Amino acid sequence: MAFPTSVPLLILLLTFGLLGRPGSATDFVIYSDPPTALLPGQMFHYDLTPQDIPYGRASLVMKPDCNLVLYFNGSKTWATNTTGLGDNCYLTIDSHGEAIVQRNIHYPVWRSNKTSVVGSYAFLLQWNGELGIYGPAIWSSSNEGELSDPKPSNITTDYVFYSYSVLPIGKILEYKNYRLVLRDDCNLVLLDTNTNTQDIKWQTNTYSPLHDCFITLDPNGELFVKHNRRDILWRSNETTNSNFSALVLRYDAKLVIYGPQLWTTKPLW
């Protein structure tokens, strides 16, 4: 569960427009736009093992003593080593892709020290128990952004899809009441499950009678719906010079592809 946050700090962050919404324990992504943060005493958690998926158990904790600590399977694996450097410390990511631990609103005590062009970035607690920063944004779905169900979730759902992954017909991603599904007719659909009719927020409008569709994300950040083994039904048509990217179903109901991987605690290869 998430630990209590500093209410005065939260009010200040909201007042100065530095925070879109506070995260919950089952979140594991921080965004530069709309901006989110990991607040004092909060924990992000990634654990799909209760669903018989061998990813997790990973946690990222912004400790009250100002140290940002990463745990994997109960063991400490990485930290900013900023214990005692301030009060009310919190983690954000800026529009250049740099992760920053700050105290008292705007005094930095730690930086990731990797930057890129101005854009939209995502800071991820990854499936392998490491941290990664991706961006800038390459592509986003055309639907309007909105807020998800404010009720906290008690289980981790996977809402990030990485390069080199392939998924067949069925549920692809899920964040609270938003669900990305590849239907049996090969239409990739983003649904709001809070409505009686499961309103469609976005779709590829694709169809195939073969019922053998799958989606894949290329290293260069291009998303595909394919069938008949490799024939393309739909593509996002946006690419970048990248060897690894990530598709994220955000809390505002937008699908966004970020790439390349700008920074990580441990390279994948």
Language model features by range: what are they?
Residues A2-W269:
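Beta-rich ligand-binding surfaces for carbohydrates and other polyanions
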